[in-house]
């Protein structure tokens, strides 16, 4: 059995009932075979793959809080500090009922490579809770966030671990979390990113993941002799990533025609009305079914099916494993030329392989959605310097970071004879930097 197969088997055995984590490890290690085989003796001796797939620290804790009826509720909190070889742990917090240790480990593992790809000095981590913010009052969300931070504060710090937002954690939640951290610690430091502009946040942070996704898509298409302008795009999701991906798509001359939420999806052949979408999701916090009140000629469909829409480009921006094999077949049949992941691992392994085998250009989330964490790191820099950069400065830095990420992964793929395979390129480019740092720092 090869070293890669041994480590994959160990991960599955030691981490039962964590399919998302198994999937993430398998996808990364399979694509690293060519590098591992060239360095197998050294990697085995130093147990590099075992150390890479085992988090440095896994924290689980109880989160008690009181709802508006006076009833005590209890949720579980998580923080997985996966790898700090190249910098302090950095990664978001996710509040969603599906959250468990396996999902947080998969997200933290992916974050290690994503953060490495940015070229910035940040390690990988992830956290969250099975708390569901949907349907909760502001007071209940504040109570939960304060209780969550009352334990989490012990494990984080501006030079140790800097969380950010993710699904279910936006500006409101970051504000409540930051307020409680400051109250407990009595220090004003950049311990969270995604903060409000009045208390240390960065301009362009909210837009960064969606904008970065489109900068990556444009650069990848350009490398392949294709113009983004004039293309039609399927976008899934209706949160932060999707909304600002749609906004930047319009700015770059493309036409996004869909959006989705947990109940259904919209198809607007004239192009999604961005202002209507923002009002529904950011102001009203309502369901997408409201959209047809703004645009009577648009279609609303309950359930799934967005990948059946005919378009040139697909941008999955909702959640893990949303794009499955049958969806990939529909995309190929409809002539899609590129898929770029705005969410974390939204495409299953089988779907990814099918897309690649059928000549679809494919950029994985760890590269395509790295704009969010890159701009979080820029927020950390501004906090450290006690400065605030303009929107244009941050956006220009973000654009250059995304261009650099693409060319780094493109070069890595070509170096190992895998030209055009951006999954392999992203994993190799992220892996090499982390492994070099781990080796230099010894067995720790």
What are these regions (language model features)?
Residues 264-362, 367:
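Rossmann-like adenosine-cofactor binding region
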Residues 2, 16-23, 27, 43, ...:
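Conserved active-site and cofactor/substrate-binding residues in soluble primary-metabolism enzymes
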Residues 193-196, 201-310:
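Glycine-rich phosphate/diphosphate-binding loop of Rossmann-like nucleotide-binding domains
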Residues 19-22, 38-45, 119, 156-165, ...:
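Flexible, glycine/charged-enriched surface loops at secondary-structure junctions
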Residues 41-71:
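Structured beta-strand/loop patches that form or line metal/cofactor-binding pockets in enzymes
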Residues 2-19, 24, 220, 332-444:
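Adenosine-phosphate binding glycine-rich loop
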Residues 96, 115-229:
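Glycine/serine-rich phosphate-binding loop and adjoining beta1-alpha1 elements at the start
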């Amino acid at each position: 059995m090869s070293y890669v197969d041994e480590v994959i088997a160990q991960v599955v055995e030691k981490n039962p009932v964590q399919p998302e984590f198994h999937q993430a490890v398998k996808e990364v290690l399979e694509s690293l075979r060519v590098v591992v085989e060239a360095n197998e003796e050294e990697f085995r001796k130093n147990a590099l793959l075992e150390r890479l797939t085992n988090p440095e620290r896994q924290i689980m804790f109880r989160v008690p809080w009181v709802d508006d009826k006076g009833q005590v509720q209890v949720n579980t909190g998580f923080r997985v500090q996966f790898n700090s070889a190249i910098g302090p742990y950095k990664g978001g917090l996710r509040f969603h009922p599906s959250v468990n240790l396996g999902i947080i480990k998969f997200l933290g593992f992916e974050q290690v490579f994503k953060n490495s790809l940015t070229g910035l000095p940040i390690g990988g981590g992830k956290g969250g809770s099975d708390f569901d913010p949907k349907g909760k009052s502001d007071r209940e969300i504040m109570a939960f966030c304060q209780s969550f931070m009352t334990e989490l504060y012990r494990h984080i710090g501006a030079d140790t671990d800097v969380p950010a937002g993710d699904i279910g954690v936006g500006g409101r939640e970051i504000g409540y979390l930051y307020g409680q951290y400051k109250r407990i610690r009595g220090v004003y430091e950049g311990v969270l990113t995604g903060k409000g502009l009045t208390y240390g946040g960065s301009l362009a942070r909210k837009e960064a993941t969606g904008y970065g996704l489109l900068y990556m898509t444009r650069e990848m298409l350009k490398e392949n002799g294709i113009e983004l302008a004039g293309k039609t795009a399927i976008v899934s999701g209706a949160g932060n990533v999707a909304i600002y991906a749609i906004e930047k798509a319009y700015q770059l001359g493309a036409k996004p025609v869909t959006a989705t939420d947990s109940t259904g999806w919209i198809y607007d052949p004239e192009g999604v009305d961005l202002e209507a979408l923002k009002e529904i999701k950011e102001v009203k916090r309502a369901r997408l079914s409201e959209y047809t009140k703004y645009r009577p000629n648009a279609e609303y469909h309950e359930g799934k099916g967005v990948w059946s829409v005919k378009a040139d480009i697909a941008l999955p921006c909702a959640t893990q494993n949303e794009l499955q094999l049958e969806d990939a077949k529909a995309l190929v049949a409809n002539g899609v030329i590129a898929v770029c992941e705005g969410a974390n691992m939204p495409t299953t392994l089988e779907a990814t392989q099918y897309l690649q085998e059928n000549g679809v250009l494919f950029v994985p989330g760890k590269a395509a959605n790295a704009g969010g964490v890159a701009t979080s790191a820029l927020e950390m820099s501004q906090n450290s310097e006690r400065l605030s950069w303009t929107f244009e400065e941050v956006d220009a830095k973000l654009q250059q970071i995304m261009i650099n990420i693409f060319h780094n992964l493109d070069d890595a793929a070509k170096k190992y004879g895998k030209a055009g395979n951006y999954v392999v390129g992203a994993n190799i480019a992220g892996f090499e930097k982390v492994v070099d740092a781990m080796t230099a720092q010894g067995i720790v």
